[in-house]
């Protein structure tokens, strides 16, 4: 094995030799000192500088950090060859810094010590090939791998379940058709042909710290004849509402199926886990090529699922195992959007959990971010933003304008891209901004100040219109002062309603009595006398009583 791994040997640069008095002048220190660590095998190699001296042996010491004294290196004392195996060294930890030194010896003479640069065994160790055991099926090969190192390995004691195995497989008849894949310590290679010879090799590696091992020797095996009852193929599992639906393909009829599941982490443990498979509820002895089971069968994590067909006493081989990640199957429902206007022409958006998420919010199970599409209602220009918050505000918007928003949930994980559909679009109108409010206040104040002036102007215009088109029936005061003080209401009376005054004529040659009656009829004066009153003697008079009294007084005077 060491010959196989010679290419991976580590070269440790030697330091300056630690010079001690030598017994012979021709005995020199070893050269080209090399330390090779593969798994738990520690090999020290060197080149002799005293080939001309016979009976030369070599001895080495080691020292660990914290030790004051040098200790003889086991397996490397009085060695006649140019290498030694010190795998039996009792190291407290493979993570401690270690020092080595070596010298040549012959008789009582010794060369100066040649001290090797200090090193940490784990950092310098190389990963050896795993042990490989193969079993054949008709269309598959079962692989059983043992991790590198010994059973009680000190070097890989903390990493035995962390190894990642890389396999290269090809048909023996054609090495050009190589296929490389990552496998577990207990795994199965599918999609092979029956009765065919396949060859493969495997190497192990660590991801942290990153270490890559060497390939194992090549192993070859023949697949068996085709099984009379084929295995189910093309397994597929999907989440629908609160259940999982497992489907597969099968060409034969009148068969029943059963499905089992296994925790994926068990695959990393290098041991037989065939008894760890468990039956899936509602997926036993089913006659259809699908089965439905509740989601609570699986907790959050990664699992493997396999299906087997049965026909009476005959059973098929297990199908190819389907890797199933519950996180990948989780259904993301669209979020619930709430938007309301706030001051200064801004809109506040709130994102809530959907009703379909039952009693647990989706973001309690997975870290979510939200893709938010925001736009003005009358515009096709959209603003696309990503938000981790469930409450945020869009500011500096146009006052009294309708804006619309919709959003979808995304799983915040670089390993996959999962998202929900977009939510329903929600639209809301912004409030007036501070500028609009200032203009509104200014407008109100201006209206209050201009109202008296407008009112006065309207009043003046109204008076002018009334004066021109609707003049007053009463004469102006300058004209009215020439009329009698008696009212003119009688002028408006009809003829039948006019008051009359009866005049009496008394003939007296010596005395002429003139009765003068003044009436205000159409602003003219009427007179009545004894000389001219030979007509009917009927006159209109406003005050009949006063006229009668005056007439009676005149008659009495005449009689006297």
UniProtKB/Swiss-Prot annotation:
Pfam families for the chain: Interfer-bind (PF09294), Tissue_fac (PF01108)
Transmembrane segments: 438-458
UniProt xrefs under InterPro entries: FN3_dom, FN3_sf, Ig-like_fold, Interferon/interleukin_rcp_dom, Interferon_alpha/beta_rcpt-1, Type-II_Cytokine-TF_Rcpt
Positions in the Cytoplasmic compartment: 459-560
Compartment list: Cell membrane; Late endosome; Lysosome
UniProt biased composition (Polar residues): 527-539
Residue span, Fibronectin type-III domain: 29-125, 133-224, 231-329, 333-433
PROSITE patterns in alphabetical order: FN3
GO BP terms, alphabetized: cellular response to interferon-alpha; response to lipopolysaccharide; type I interferon-mediated signaling pathway
Region feature Disordered, mapped onto this chain: 520-560
Compositionally biased intervals (Basic and acidic residues): 550-560
Regions of this protein lying in the Extracellular compartment: 25-437
Mod. after translation: Ubiquitinated, leading to its internalization and degradation. Polyubiquitinated via 'Lys-48'-linked and 'Lys-63'-linked ubiquitin chains, leading to receptor internalization and lysosomal degradation. The 'Lys-63'-linked ubiquitin chains are cleaved off by the BRISC complex. Phosphorylated on tyrosine residues in response to interferon-binding: phosphorylation by TYK2 tyrosine kinase creates docking sites for STAT proteins. Phosphorylated on serine residues in response to interferon binding; this promotes interaction with FBXW11 and ubiquitination.
Recorded superkingdom: Eukaryota
Gene Ontology CC terms, in alphabetical order: late endosome; lysosome; plasma membrane
UniProt KW keywords: Cell membrane, Disulfide bond, Endosome, Glycoprotein, Lipoprotein, Lysosome, Membrane, Palmitate, Phosphoprotein, Receptor, Repeat, Signal, Transmembrane, Transmembrane helix, Ubl conjugation
Major subcellular site: membrane
Sites of S-palmitoyl cysteine lipidation: 464
Residue numbers of Phosphoserine PTMs: 496, 536
Presence of keyword Repeat: yes
Role summary: Together with IFNAR2, forms the heterodimeric receptor for type I interferons (including interferons alpha, beta, epsilon, omega and kappa). Type I interferon binding activates the JAK-STAT signaling cascade, resulting in transcriptional activation or repression of interferon-regulated genes that encode the effectors of the interferon response. Mechanistically, type I interferon-binding brings the IFNAR1 and IFNAR2 subunits into close proximity with one another, driving their associated Janus kinases (JAKs) (TYK2 bound to IFNAR1 and JAK1 bound to IFNAR2) to cross-phosphorylate one another.
The family this protein is said to belong to: Belongs to the type II cytokine receptor family.
Assembly and interaction partners: Heterodimer with IFNAR2; forming the receptor for type I interferon. Interacts with TYK2. Interacts with STAT1 and STAT2; the interaction requires its phosphorylation at Tyr-482. Interacts (serine-phosphorylated form) with FBXW11, the substrate recognition component of a SCF (SKP1-CUL1-F-box protein) E3 ubiquitin-protein ligase complex. Interacts with SHMT2; this promotes interaction with ABRAXAS2 and the BRISC complex. Interacts with TRIM10; this interaction prevents association between IFNAR1 and TYK2.
Protein name per its UniProtKB record: Interferon alpha/beta receptor 1
Organism: Sus scrofa (Pig)
